[in-house]
Each structure stands twice: as structure tokens, then as C-alpha cells.
Amino acid sequence: MAFRYNTPDPELSIKLENPRHLSSGHLPRYIPGETIIGVVRRTTPGAVPEARVVVTLHGKCTSKIKIKRGNSESRYESSFNCLSAPMEPEILFSNAPLHIPQGEGMSWPFAVTIPSVVEDVRRADQRKHYTLPGGSTFPPPGSFAMYSESIWTTGEQVRASVEYYVQARIELSHVHRGITKKAIHTAKAPFQLRNVNIGPPITDFRLKRHQMTHMIAAYKLVPGMGDLTFGQKTRQTFMTTSVPRLTFKLNVILPHTLQIENESPIPIYLSAEPVTGSTTEIIHDVPQTIVIKSFMLRLKQQTLVQAEKHSSVTSEAVNLIPNTAIGALGREVSLTVMPRTSGQSEEPARVNLGEMLDFRMRKHGLQPTFKTYNVGRTYNLAWEVEGRVVGEKFKLGYTHQAKVLPGPSPYNEPDFERPAPRPEALPEYLELSEAPPAYSA
């Protein structure tokens, strides 16, 4: 199916024959290594003694930072070629007479291939402010666009983009009164470049465990405790040593790698284990219920934009699991801990919260983690648990770095070999994070 990307122009127009993912109002998408097939057409009648028609693949990543300070304004810009050295033009018609009769037209088919990898294009003077995106070679970045404005704080406006297009150019030469004159017309066909992760959707989300310790001080931890006296309430408020204490470790096992357009279920495990040595002896061998009231998972994206010696970081958050999700289940989610007087505590039972909440990477309009010379996108995954033990509230939370992979390559693509799926890592091999909590209440 053909799709026209520029307004039809009798002087010159482009028609791409093989775009994928066509939808109204959206540019077509290609992937690195793919060949773009199309046709350049001219319908303006006439004859010239010499003409030349070429097409060239273009890619550029640009950044612009504008800063207002009172009545003054500073602008900083940068632009890099995303496709290594300038791509060699494909010559479709060269240095020959061109005659187009009235009511007809002339077409030239073309095929240009998007590079699978590109090389460093920084000049020596640019290496001070702009870092290399990858190793000696790296994939071209996917299409990207962002705009940020913070008038009420720094008066800063930031724009960044990664853009690709095919450009056609026709040069018409003729001699007038002994002087060779040249008329030039161009046409552009923009498209989106979509990076892919070779193979089927991932099943290994790099699960890791975060372990956080919390203490509850309450008389209600003792079975059969009735209404509290005024003195007990006072001692509990000030958490005196006479108030029974339960100390437990909350284990949260969750992904450190996510993938766009991968709707496979993602596990999130919760478990709790007692810390007997820090628990009041009177409640040893007494099971305690930890009721999980809410769980929130948020993906925080940061975009770094560099323009000359100036840089800007903008942040935005996307809710993957809202804090109302557990309440919407209509049933209680709980964990049980029981400090043992003697012997080792039993292996704590796990709750697969991801399965309960049907957690999947649905479409959130996300970009994968990426870095170019002047633009980069990184992610942090923040979680928060709210719970109760014998009516006493607590809140725990943590933030860790996460990587968002591009979507999987299409299975029906003959150019891609499907590797065997990797099994999910077993819990006993998960890494333990002993870092202090971001907050605890």
C-alpha cells in the first residue's frame, strides 16, 4: 500500500511504498537495517537539456535551550547527524536530457537502507561537552521529541528531537544567453525510526529483592488486649520501652528491566519475615497479620538535554500501578509473621502482587532508555507500600534505577532470528538490596 508523506507537488513529490504501522495522523515506522522503498515523481511538463535526481537519507538530533534572565535572553543550540557521516545520495537520474510531455509524468524508483549501526561524528571541539552514546559503533537512536517550559522558576525553555526523513532533490540545468542556470526543487518524506529488541518479548525482567526493616509498637500486639487505659495510650504514643514491639523485614521483589509493547505478566512478590531478636518476648510465637492497604508503582522518566555547555534535566512520572489498585480488588491482601522463641522461623510465604493486579507493560507512550550526543532518557522505578498491623499504620517506599527496553522485533520478520526465551530468575538467586529506605513512616 502506498502512502504519501508530503503534499503532492507537480515539481517533485515522494511516495513510499512499504511503510509499516500506517495509521491516520501518524508517520510510518521503520527499524534499523530496514530498506525504504519508494518513488520520486515529477509531473510538471517541459524539457531541459540536463537534469539530475537524487535521494538521500537524513537523520539529526537537535537540542535547544532558551534561558530568560530579566530582560535578557540566551539561546544555546546543538545538532548532530544521527547516521554517522552524511549518507551518500542515491543517484536516480544523472546528467541527461529530461522531457516530460503535457499530461504525463516521470517517476524514479529508489531503495535506501537505514544503517544498523552508526559511528561517532563528534568533532574534537565537541568532545568536551558531548559524550559518546555507546562504544565504537552503536544503533541509531529512535525518533524522539520533547518540549519543556519552566517560566515560573528559571524561565527556561527546552526542546529536543531526533528526526529522520528521506529527501529527494531534482536539479534542472539550462543555458540562457550563454549562462548555465540551475533550478532546484526538493521534497521530504519524514518517518519514525523505531528501535527494537531482537527476538520475542522478554520474560526475564531482572527481578531483584529490596528488604526493609520496620518496627511496630502497640499493646494490641498482645492477644486478648482490651481497650487501652489513658496511661497505656500515653506510653504507646511516646513509644516507651514497656510497649510491646514487633520488628519485621518486608521483602519486595520487583523488576529492574521493562519492555515497551511487551504485555507479558510481570511478577511482583511481597513477603515478610520477623526479626525475633528485636521483638518483645511476650509476643513470641504469636502470629501477626500485616494487612497491605495499598501498593503504588511509578516510573519516573528523566530527560537530559545538552546544548553547548548548558544542560537541562526534566522529569515526569507515569503511574504503572495506582495506589487504588489493591482497594479495587475487593478482598484483603495480607502477610503473616510469627517470631519464634526457639528454632529458625519458617520460610515466609510470598504474595504475587503482580499476578493479583494483572501487572503488564501496557501502552503508556514511553520511549526506551536511550542516549545520543545531546539528548538522553533514563528511568527510575519508585514503589510505595502502605499497611497496617493491629490497626497501626506504616508506609515504606524505595526508588531504584530501571531500564526500559525497546519493543520486541516482529515475529514474522525473516531478518530476525528468534532466540530461545530466557527463564525467569529463581527467587533464591535474587540480589539483596540493603540500602536504607528512601523514607519510612
Model regions: which residues?
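Internal, hydrophobic beta-strand segments that form the core of beta-sheet-rich folds
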Residues: 40, 56-61, 110-115, 125-175, ...
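Eukaryotic beta-rich interaction modules
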Residues: 15-23, 32-39, 246-252, 273-282, ...
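Short amphipathic, basic-aromatic surface patches that mediate peripheral association
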Residues: 41-46, 118-122, 272-288, 305
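A cross-kingdom feature marking solvent-exposed beta-strand/loop segments within repeated
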Residues: 91-97, 122-123, 144-151, 176, ...
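General structural concept
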Residues: 3-146, 387, 396
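Contiguous beta-strand segments within globular domains
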Residues: 28-41, 258-274
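Beta-strand-dominated scaffold domains
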Residues: 56-106, 192, 203-235, 282-374, ...
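Flexible, low-complexity coil/linker segments
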Residues: 1-18, 151-271, 403-436
